[in-house]
UniProtKB/Swiss-Prot annotation:
E.C. no: 1.4.4.2
InterPro entries tied to this protein: GcvPA (IPR023010), GDC-P_N (IPR049315), GDC_P (IPR020581), PyrdxlP-dep_Trfase (IPR015424), PyrdxlP-dep_Trfase_major (IPR015421), PyrdxlP-dep_Trfase_small (IPR015422)
High-level lineage: Archaea, Thermoproteota, Thermoprotei, Sulfolobales, Sulfolobaceae
Similarity annotation: Belongs to the GcvP family. N-terminal subunit subfamily.
Pfam families the UniProt entry points to: GDC-P
Protein's gene: gcvPA
Superkingdom assignment: Archaea
Catalytic activity: N(6)-[(R)-lipoyl]-L-lysyl-[glycine-cleavage complex H protein] + glycine + H(+) = N(6)-[(R)-S(8)-aminomethyldihydrolipoyl]-L-lysyl-[glycine-cleavage complex H protein] + CO2
Descriptive protein name: Probable glycine dehydrogenase (decarboxylating) subunit 1
Enzyme class: oxidoreductase
Purpose: The glycine cleavage system catalyzes the degradation of glycine. The P protein binds the alpha-amino group of glycine through its pyridoxal phosphate cofactor; CO(2) is released and the remaining methylamine moiety is then transferred to the lipoamide cofactor of the H protein.
Keyword Oxidoreductase included in the entry's annotation: yes
PANTHER family, A to Z: GLYCINE CLEAVAGE SYSTEM P-PROTEIN, GLYCINE DEHYDROGENASE (DECARBOXYLATING)
Length: 449
């Protein structure tokens, strides 16, 4: 009787072992030292395989051990809770989209390609940039790719970054650029928490500066207010400018394109993506219409063309940049991307529209400043005095661990600990006035003993 071709069994295993010239599966691990091999059964709570129903009961038992917060977390740090409309969830669960497979065959992928083209178009309009790729992993990876783009263009090794940039992004960049010998040099902040341009001017006299990075707003939520001046300095020195920007903040501030920024990066998490222990996210990367910049872009780019019959069609373009075509000569080794998340962002942006983004940004600004005002009533002041959006850092002048643990006892998650006494709070449209008031009263109780 023939064996089923897709089910593993002893005969197949024997044939595979014979074909590679070993006698047993143990021989495959001969290079692993004996002292670190596991030579006993796994110490599990159950001694036999479980049925599907028993597994579900076990998982529910574990799930019930989780504590549930009574309100969205106030945890800052670059990823914040936002409301995800039901239509976004519905559309990305459709079988036509629910895959990360790259649409190499345009003749059977017009729907997916058009959806990604719409995403690129919407981001281009929001950022006022001209070329957008079809997504990267997250903000950190997009920034690393932008820095390596700059390095490939001008061959220089130093990148000036704000001291108050997102530290998690900085760690990603250090990891990605280590092999290239790229050096990050921090620009100190002023008392407002923005880039100290007087210090910057003395730092960019070096001939080896490849790029200047500006984060808008920065890790502390503070708006940079001298971007035009920084860009002007960079252009005079022929230094590439990179801006990382919060998409929702663009409902209040000038987009990167108005500053003539060379490369823009960001994260689409706030454009219709839920928080799931930090992922999946959506790396955004956009450039000016410049041949050098576009040719050095990483990732997929969807273009609009016409077929042999003159009909409109969508297809992947400039594919000779990519690793499946060029291998080690590619602009990046990034492959399966965040296409599903890009479609979610496209649906979200289409749903809100230009006016919706402005109204949402205004609401976030008002609520976050209300929270800051209420904290000031308790004698808790911000670390920097610059204007901010969504996130702000405060100094409690006492051990924040004590405050945070007491908040958790009330099922309230406070801000991100920055130091012994400081924390970064995030307030968005999902935090109502009553939630903010309850947070303040809970902190007041901690202060009163």
């Amino acid at each position: 009787m023939d064996m089923h071709p897709w089910l593993p069994n002893i005969k197949y295993i024997e044939e595979m072992l014979k074909s590679i010239g070993v006698n047993s599966i143990d021989d495959l691990f001969i290079d692993v030292p004996e002292e670190i091999k596991l030579k006993k059964e796994l110490d599990l709570d159950y001694k036999k395989p479980l049925s599907e129903y028993e597994i579900i009961l076990k998982l529910q038992e574990l799930q019930n051990k989780n504590k549930r917060l009574k309100m969205p977390p106030f945890l800052g740090g670059g990823l914040c809770p936002h409301y995800v409309p039901e239509v976004v969830k519905f559309i990305i669960k459709r079988s036509e989209f629910y895959t990360a497979y790259t649409p190499y065959q345009p003749e059977i992928s017009q729907g997916l390609l058009q959806a990604l083209f719409e995403y690129q178009s919407l981001i281009a309009e929001l950022f006022e940039m001209e070329v957008v790729n079809a997504s990267l992993y997250d903000w950190g990876s997009a920034l690393a790719e932008a820095i390596m783009m700059a390095n490939r263009i001008n061959k220089k090794k130093t990148v000036l970054v704000p001291k108050l940039m997102n530290p998690y992004h900085k760690e990603v960049v250090k990891t990605w650029t280590y092999g290239k010998g790229i050096k990050l040099v921090e620009i100190p902040p002023n008392e407002r928490g923005t880039i100290d341009v007087s210090k910057l001017e003395s730092m960019i006299n070096e001939d080896d500066v490849s790029a200047i990075y500006i984060q808008q707003p920065n890790f502390y939520g503070i708006f940079e207010d001298e971007i035009e001046y920084i860009v002007d300095i960079a252009k005079k020195k022929k230094i590439i400018t990179i801006m990382g920007v919060s998409p929702l903040a663009l409902g209040l501030i000038k987009p990167p394109g108005e500053y003539e920024i060379d490369i823009t990066v960001g994260d689409g998490q706030e454009l219709g993506l839920s928080l799931n222990f930090g992922g999946p996210l959506l790396g955004i990367l956009a450039t000016r219409w410049d041949g050098q910049l576009v040719r050095q872009m990483p990732g997929r780019i969807v273009g609009l063309t016409k077929d042999s019959e003159g009909k409109r069609g969508f297809t992947l373009i400039l594919q000779t940049r990519e690793q499946f075509a060029r291998r080690e000569k590619a602009t990046s080794n990034i492959t399966t991307n965040e296409a599903l998340m890009a479609i979610a962002a496209a649906v979200y942006l289409s749903l809100l529209g230009r006016n919706g983004i402005k109204e949402l940004a205004k609401e976030i600004y008002i609520r976050s400043h209300y929270a800051k005002k209420r904290l000031e009533e308790l004698g808790v002041n911000t670390v920097y005095n610059g204007d901010f959006f969504e996130e702000f850092a405060v100094d409690f002048r006492t051990d924040y661990d004590i405050i945070h643990s007491r908040l958790l006892e009330k099922n309230i998650h406070g801000g991100l600990k920055l130091g012994k006494t400081q924390a970064l709070f995030c307030v968005t449209e999902v935090h109502t006035k009553s939630m903010i008031d309850e947070l303040i009263e809970s902190i007041r109780e901690v202060f009163s003993g």
